[in-house]
Amino acid sequence: MKRAFIMVLDSFGIGATEDAERFGDAGSDTLGHIAEACAKGEADIGRKGPLHLPNLTKLGLAKAHEGATGFIPAGMDGNAEITGAYAWAHELSSGKDTPSGHWEIAGVPVLFDWGYFTDEKNSFPQELLDKLVERANLPGYLGNCHSSGTVILDELGEEHMKTGKPIFYTSADSVFQIACHEETFGLDRLYELCEIAREELTEGGYNIGRVIARPFVGDKAGNFQRTGNRHDLAVEPPSPVVLKKLVDEKGGHVVSVGKIADIYANMGITKKVKATGLDALFDATIKEMKEAGDNTIVFTNFVDFDSSWGHRRDVAGYAAGLELFDRRLPELLELVGEDDIIIFTADHGCDPTWKGTDHTREHIPVLVYGPKVKPGSLGHRDTFADIGQTVAKYFGLSDMEYGKALF
């Protein structure tokens, strides 16, 4: 029985890539800078001391970081026994966004340029805004700018509740984000508005990767909170990802846990499981791994590293999340059967010590474990697509166009 489990620690980069300067990210290092802050006692909120990741270290995390940067992260054991195969991978795609990283992991790099809304204020074309107001029968809109999602709620949340005007905003990513109150505006109405926005952006040729529904609750600035009912409306990958090949060529199954299905616009997904928060995502993943049959991929995105701690530049929170993940990791490994493989990786960086609030262009770790996987270094990889090619080879599928199998 063959099964593959893919675990994406969203934004867990391990050091700037050679082309990071082009993105303003030269010197960024999500893991390295978190470890450095922990070792200096600068991340002792809710946790304490050096970054403690013994299980990920045994799989080769510290060694992968050394391969990418030339050094072992501060406080981590560079001499630990290695039980997994490890590599560090460079992104071939043109961006440093979630769809690009995930599509490339599944064998389809993004070799075109996404569209972006680059103006910090008055970010969106008036023609687009007018169409949204007309089609969705809106009283107007708020925002129309670049912002962090939590900051804009404090700035505009109360006005949104009073006026019923949705909050439109974007970032350095190829996104159109809409924040609305779940109760006063309505969750279904927000989803309908996002569908309209997706249609207008596609028909208008804006080439925007995602429309993101950002529902929130609360009654005043300071206590607004985003809920777990986020929904991403992505465009489809330009060619079949390895997930779809497994379904089409082997009649296989692909289980999405978390936001995976949204990222791939449901391409190749046969079952969707929603969960919010690290522990809930872990619990859902464990349940699906236990139930998975032959020719199945269980694919989980652990979004909190990115959304809760990376973008918010919360070093201590990110460190605590990593340590929680590491403590629970053995629960996943014990479910890996004789012919199974489990892969731990990331889709980009989001260094919580870096300027601004955006992603960082970094190498990602590729940590592979399985009873038949030979431990040791798999070296530098030129593309994340090596993961997709490995999965294709493992299941006996036709070759992906990009990538070389890890083994």
Swiss-Prot record:
E.C. number: 5.4.2.7
Cytoplasm listed as a keyword: yes
One Pfam family named in its UniProt record: Metalloenzyme
Signal peptide extent: none
Binding-site list for Mn(2+) 2: 306, 311, 359
GO terms for biological process, alphabetical: 2-deoxyribose 1-phosphate catabolic process; 5-phosphoribose 1-diphosphate biosynthetic process; metabolic compound salvage; nucleotide metabolic process
Top-rank EC class of the record's enzyme: isomerase
Localization terms from the record: Cytoplasm
UniProt-annotated binding residues for Mn(2+) 1: 10, 347-348
Alphabetic keyword roster: Cytoplasm, Isomerase, Manganese, Metal-binding
Major localization listed first in the record, in broad terms: cytoplasm
Molecular functions (GO terms): magnesium ion binding; manganese ion binding; phosphopentomutase activity
Function: Isomerase that catalyzes the conversion of deoxy-ribose 1-phosphate (dRib-1-P) and ribose 1-phosphate (Rib-1-P) to deoxy-ribose 5-phosphate (dRib-5-P) and ribose 5-phosphate (Rib-5-P), respectively.
Name of the protein in its database record: Phosphopentomutase
Organism in which the protein naturally occurs: Cronobacter sakazakii (strain ATCC BAA-894)
Gene that produces this protein: deoB
